[in-house]
Curated annotation (Swiss-Prot):
<dbReference type="InterPro" id="IPR051698">
    <property type="entry name" value="Transposase_11-like"/>
</dbReference>
<dbReference type="InterPro" id="IPR032806">
    <property type="entry name" value="YbfD_N"/>
</dbReference>
<keyword id="KW-0814">Transposable element</keyword>
<keyword id="KW-0238">DNA-binding</keyword>
<dbReference type="Pfam" id="PF01609">
    <property type="entry name" value="DDE_Tnp_1"/>
</dbReference>
<dbReference type="InterPro" id="IPR047647">
    <property type="entry name" value="ISAs1_transpos"/>
</dbReference>
<keyword id="KW-0233">DNA recombination</keyword>
<dbReference type="GO" id="GO:0004803">
    <property type="term" value="F:transposase activity"/>
</dbReference>
<dbReference type="GO" id="GO:0006313">
    <property type="term" value="P:DNA transposition"/>
</dbReference>
<keyword id="KW-0815">Transposition</keyword>
<dbReference type="InterPro" id="IPR002559">
    <property type="entry name" value="Transposase_11"/>
</dbReference>
<dbReference type="GO" id="GO:0003677">
    <property type="term" value="F:DNA binding"/>
</dbReference>
<protein>
    <recommendedName>
        <fullName>Putative transposase YncI</fullName>
    </recommendedName>
</protein>
<dbReference type="Pfam" id="PF13808">
    <property type="entry name" value="DDE_Tnp_1_assoc"/>
</dbReference>
<comment type="similarity">
    <text>Belongs to the transposase 11 family.</text>
</comment>
Length: 248
């Protein structure tokens, strides 16, 4: 990834603060935040801690003459930037750094950011829906929602931002929706969606067509894996089947 290209993208983010009262440059705060989050930070205090630990390295690329801002400052500044403009900037930078190849698996999933809930301000937790490249271990794009229940509307927005042609898109049961499947097809990609009780008729059709005994004697293409998880041995069976009318 090019650090200079990240700095170039960050530098065009509008700063709406009163310049006479500014101690830390916006570009420095955003650079610190992006680097810390990439390194695994998901709380404001963790971003500040990352800054103190990596201050000498950060100084090579940004203006940190006034040191590292405290977590409250980071939270306030990041919360007040144009989130849509920053989101667009970040996705463009990630796509510049990462070339998606045909046949890649892209996992779409939601995550609630720890520490984003503010009871005093009656502010709900922030929920992010992200597209993750399994091949390269990077997030290709993300969309913010106010609640996990809004994933259904956020996923199509995220799909619109990405180039997905000839890739496989995986989504959990929340994304098992006709509109989402159609959107993926429109993007010339394939999909692998989980089917659970939220799709009652479809779930019932799958259970009837694929009872457990079918898997143990399946005659078509299949694959199985075994692993120990949470103290129990799990066997996962995968089969390839043609789509029949009851599954449409």
């Amino acid at each position: 990834m090019s650090i200079q290209s990240l700095l170039d993208y960050i530098s065009v983010t509008p700063d709406i603060r009163q310049q006479g009262k500014v101690k830390h440059k916006l570009s420095a705060i955003l650079f610190l935040t992006v680097c810390a989050v990439i390194a695994g930070a998901d709380e404001w205090q963790e971003i500040e801690d990352f800054g103190h630990e990596r201050l000498e390295w950060l100084k090579k690329y940004g203006d940190f003459d006034n040191g590292i801002p405290v977590d409250d400052t980071i939270a306030r500044v990041v919360s007040n930037i144009d989130s849509l403009a920053f989101e667009k900037m970040f996705i463009e930078w990630m796509q510049e750094c990462h070339e998606i190849t045909d046949g890649e698996i892209i996992a779409i999933d939601g995550k609630t950011i720890r520490g984003s809930f503010d009871k005093g301000k009656r502010k709900g937790a922030i929920h992010m829906v992200s597209a993750f490249s399994n091949e390269n271990g990077v997030v290709l794009g993300q969309v913010k929602t106010e609640a996990k229940s809004n994933e259904i509307t956020a996923i199509p927005e995220l799909l619109n931002l990405l180039y997905l042609k000839k890739n496989l898109i995986t989504i959990d049961a929340m994304g098992c929706q006709k509109d989402i499947a159609s959107k993926i097809k429109d993007k010339k990609a394939d999909y692998l969606l989980a089917v659970k009780g939220n799709q009652g008729k479809l779930h019932h059709a799958f259970e009837e067509k694929f009872p457990v005994n079918v898997f143990s004697n399946y005659k078509g293409d299949s694959f199985s894996t075994q692993e120990i998880s949470h103290g129990r041995k799990e066997t996962r069976l995968h089969i390839v089947s043609n789509v029949t009318p009851e599954l449409l």
